[in-house]
UniProtKB/Swiss-Prot annotation:
Entries under CDD domains matching the protein: RecA-like_PEX1_r2
Organism: Schizosaccharomyces pombe (strain 972 / ATCC 24843)
Protein name in UniProt: Peroxisomal ATPase pex1
A molecular-function term among this protein's GO annotations: ATP hydrolysis activity
Entry's family note: Belongs to the AAA ATPase family.
Keyword 4Fe-4S applies: no
Length: 937
């Protein structure tokens, strides 16, 4: 395509091409390049450019400065074509055109590292420019492309090497010139060949350092006075930086990012003898003095310094004239200080693993840091956030030049805005002084969460958040500072409003899968030197569904303690047997479940009479998937997880649901409908989210919604909109992007027609079970189950009652027997009062008494209060009270069905219409389509 060159202030090496060319691209523009052929004086020259993706007006738009660099004139005709830029550059070596360009590049090395690909995407052998935020630009000349090619695509993994081009006249400096450099504590960026034979206390300076000294003075940073250090020349260069050995950094508490003045030491201190007073270990420590002394060869020691060496958990107080250690055996004498307690190091209550339990999220954070974006990582307490913080801190300490700081937001003094502002100003000053910086904000939710009941921020809180927002946004624009926040999920409206302003990326830590739990448990047991079989670890990983990382650590500690106790009591054989593991699992309660209220009912499954269809459905949906979870996981079909029990009042819906907790190996959470509703916006939805989150943590778990029609009515009928939002949230939780793995929903209602129809569709409440009035056989079974609790004189009377109680519900039958029992109790009380004769009227003759008289005589020998208590104790057993036939008939006369004919007819018509509307289309489809989904009525 022929077009003309048009100048435009693009401030980039990317170009704009006509829309006609862009339409021919089917993939992202990053995968393509523009080939521009220029013909001048019968000489053709080809250029290659990266595409910006912005269409132009029938012209080839290019930055004017970049065009002058390539000698492309405005309005010059060129031929354009789109080519597939599949060639990837692994290494690009470039050189600044002038020494001024080198100085600018050296001062802005960190910015270039992050933003080079934004302006220069397709590498060629032609000169190019990079614009800086200040408005200046740097010219570079490519020297080498590996693999060699006319053009290639730059990736984030491409290694870019900048060859220094120093000003030769400026290198000829005075002897005592001080050079300002930013320090980096020794890490993996340094080649092993440089650090292998280096002294324990030294600095690594670039090759272009003036005079390449062997010994240097260093001042600034956090040093109280000038120190002298051994110098090692390092071919690996980061402009404006130097490396410092780990031992030297530990001894003087130096961190990456501190800035120092360094100059050549013309008259360094000579060799000297030193006394090292050992601190941190008792005298019987087997730490070799010769080993410590050997590490200090060719190192400079200062009088009064505190010496700390890598891999040695002890510190030394140095005394002697400042100088270098030439002969360690002769020059160093080590003594012990028994008055100093053992140095246990930094205590951290959070469990920390040597492995990374969240590799995917760890990679996400690394990518976000590469893009210079703020990140917020959320998860419940104990899920592994602290472990991730330390993993990130260790990673960037070993692989970057970032200054790092951890801020605990929960410990900030917020008694006044002045103190709050002063604290953060100090943090921001350090981050700005030592940039590039990464600031870890722990417990961020403590800053943004509101203490008000309605979730709204107060005036002081809004002022604090506005201050933080202003400072963080300004620092992000002007400085290379990255904020990584950790905390719990933001749920309220005000929190979600503030979150995107402070953090661009939000990462939620997921629950631990079985394989991940197995890896974590293996690591924990290995770190505790426990001999446990892999079969036992796999068994524990399967049984710890919903456990957080902290739960796993605490569980292993509990298990090891139980094993130790068993070892003392029963000997060392079979310490980690399955019985011990199961016992520990049964007694252990995860952190997230310690505040949860789980229901354990005394109702047994065998106590439920009738309702065979409902009981079979509950077993199919809940018991089988839980009991045979490994088999069901291999099934790719989506299993039903919801049951709706609907029917007449008193027909056993709640009774059946209550028996689940005592029958199946699941946790049971019961929710009364109205308790989820709240007058404040967002609170009801938050309650629903918390409820499902608790259930997910406790899985396998059953959520039982009683009176479901009150919490999930048809949308559009509530003037306040509260129930509409609750229904929307329940729909999202039940059948949203995140599946309810291991969480089962059981709902009960008398009015299914009032429930929102969306909740009754497949994928939500899959099984709709009608709980009808019991028939004669079911009534007899109910009466027989209830009769086991009482003493019925004539069991055959129950058959007669079952025929006389047509229209009775399960609750009515239970009330009938309880009324009969109450009649029997009243009769017994009357008999007891008659037998309680006054003691003054009794005789002393107790000979030839009948059995009943003997009992009465023994009662009369007791005080009146004792006689009454013993009578009541004999009546406390329900089976000691005999229910006779006439009592049952008398109770039947007093009772009547709780549903009168009008209510029964109304509900019957309602259930008939509900079932016909809901199921007739499916029944018709089932007659024509084989394999259609069926639903249970």
């Amino acid at each position: 395509m022929r077009c003309i060159v048009s100048y435009k202030s693009l401030r980039s090496c990317l170009v704009n091409v006509p829309e006609l060319l862009l339409e021919s691209i089917s993939e992202p523009v990053q995968n393509y390049a523009v080939q521009a052929v220029v013909c001048k004086n019968d000489i053709k020259k080809t250029f290659y450019f990266g595409i910006s993706g912005i269409p132009s007006q029938f012209s080839f738009e290019i930055d004017s400065t970049y065009a002058h660099t390539l000698k492309l004139a405005e309005n010059q005709e060129i031929n354009l074509s789109i080519i597939d830029c599949t060639h990837e550059i692994e290494q690009l070596e470039i050189e600044p055109v002038t020494s001024n360009d080198w100085e600018i590049a050296e001062r802005n090395a960190a910015w270039l590292e992050e933003n080079l690909l934004v302006q220069y995407r397709v590498a060629t052998t032609e000169r190019f420019i990079i614009y800086l935020p200040s408005g200046t630009f740097i010219q570079f000349q490519p020297l080498k492309l590996i693999p060699s090619s006319l053009c290639g695509r730059l990736l984030r993994t491409t290694e870019v090497l900048i060859t220094p081009k120093p000003n030769t006249s400026a290198i000829e400096v005075k002897e005592n010139r001080k050079v300002n450099l930013r320090c980096v504590v020794e890490n993996r960026l340094l080649p092993d060949s440089v650090t292998a034979d280096s002294p324990a206390l030294c600095v690594f300076l670039p090759l272009n350092f003036p005079d390449r000294p062997d010994v240097v003075y260093m001042d600034g940073g956090n040093l109280k006075s000038t120190i002298v250090c051994q110098c090692v020349s390092c071919p690996f260069q980061i402009p404006g930086h130097f490396f410092i050995s780990k031992s030297l950094a530990l001894s003087y508490s130096i961190k990456t990012g501190f800035k120092f003045q360094i100059w050549k030491a013309h008259n360094p201190p000579s060799s000297s003898k030193f006394i090292l007073e050992q601190k941190g270990l008792p005298p019987e420590s087997n730490l070799s003095s010769e080993l410590v002394a050997a590490k200090l060869k060719n190192s400079y020691l200062m009088d009064g310094m505190t010496l700390k060496l890598v891999d040695i958990a002890v510190s030394y107080s140095v005394s002697g004239l400042s100088g270098v250690v030439k002969n360690p055996i002769q020059d160093i004498k080590i003594t012990s200080d028994t008055n100093v307690p053992v140095n246990a190091g930094i205590r951290n209550n959070s469990p920390r693993l040597s492995m990374q339990p969240f590799p995917h999220e760890f990679a996400q954070v690394r990518n976000a840091v590469f893009l210079h974006q703020n990140i917020y990582i959320n998860g419940p307490k104990g899920c592994g956030k602290s472990n991730l913080v330390h993993s990130l801190f260790d990673y960037y300490s070993l692989n970057s030049i970032y200054f790092q700081m951890i801020v605990s937001c929960s410990e900030i003094d917020r008694s006044s805005f002045a103190k709050f502002q002063s604290f953060w100003n100090n943090v921001f000053i350090q981050a700005e002084r030592y940039e590039p910086s990464i600031i870890y904000l722990d417990d961020v939710h403590c800053l943004i969460s509101s203490s008000n009941e309605n979730g709204e921020l107060g005036f002081v809180e809004e002022r604090e958040i506005a201050f933080l927002q202003h400072q963080i946004i300004n620092l992000k624009r002007k400085r290379k500072i990255i904020f990584i926040g950790f905390g719990e999920e933001f749920l309220t409206f005000s929190e979600n409003l503030v979150l995107p302003l402070l953090f661009q990326i939000k990462i939620a830590l997921p629950s631990l899968a079985v394989t991940r739990r197995k890896e974590i448990l293996t690591t924990i047991f290995q770190e505790n030197f426990s001999d446990i079989t892999m079969d036992s670890i796999e068994f524990i990983s399967v049984k710890t569904e919903g456990y957080l990382m902290t739960d796993l650590v605490l569980f292993v500690k509990r298990l090891l303690s139980e094993a130790f106790v068993e070892k003392i009591q029963n000997g060392p054989k079979h310490l980690m047997n399955k019985g011990l593991i199961e016992k520990t699992l049964k007694d252990f309660v995860p952190l997230q479940l310690r505040k949860a209220k789980f229901v354990k009912s005394s109702i047994r499954w065998i106590d439920i009479a009738g309702m065979q269809e409902a009981k079979e459905a509950v077993r199919d949906i809940i018991e089988s998937p839980v009991k045979y979870s490994l088999i069901y996981k291999q099934c790719r079909l989506r299993l039903p997880t919801g049951i709706l029990l609907f029917g007449y009042p008193g027909c056993g819906k709640t009774y059946l649901a209550s028996a689940i907790s005592s029958t199946f190996p699941v946790q049971f959470i019961s929710i009364k409908g109205p308790e989820l509703l709240d007058k404040y916006i967002g609170k009801s939805e938050q309650g629903v989210r918390d409820l499902f989150s608790r259930a997910q943590m406790a899985k396998p778990c059953v959520l039982f919604f009683d009176e479901f029609d009150s919490v999930a009515p048809r949308r559009g009928q509530d003037s306040t909109g509260v129930t509409d939002r609750v229904v929307n949230q329940i729909l999202t939780q039940m059948d949203g992007a995140e599946s309810l793995d291991g969480v089962y929903i059981v709902a009960a209602t008398t009015r299914p027609d009032m429930i929102d129809p969306a909740l009754l569709r497949p994928g939500r409440l899959d099984k709709l079970i009608f709980c009808d009035l019991p028939n004669e056989e079911e009534r007899l079974e109910v009466l027989q189950k209830l009769a086991n609790r009482f003493h019925i004189e004539n069991a055959a009377m129950l058959k007669k009652l079952s025929t006389l109680t047509d229209g009775y519900t399960y609750a009515d039958l239970s009330s009938l027997l309880y009324d009969a029992h109450l009649i029997a109790v009243h009769k017994l009380l009357k008999r007891v009062s008659i037998n309680a004769v006054d003691p003054s009227q009794t005789t002393s003759s107790f000979t030839n008494l009948t059995t009943e008289s003997k009992r009465n005589a023994s009662m009369l020998a007791l005080p009146p209060e004792s006689r009454y208590n013993q009578n009541m104790q004999s009546m406390s057993d329900s089976k000691s009270v005999v229910i006779e036939d006439y009592m049952l008939m008398e109770a039947l006369k007093k009772n009547s069905p709780s549903l009168n004919s009008e209510e029964f007819e109304h509900l019957s018509n309602l259930y008939r219409d509900f079932r016909s509307k809901l199921f007739e289309p499916e029944l018709n489809a089932r007659n024509t389509d084989v394999g259609s989904k069926t639903r249970q009525i």
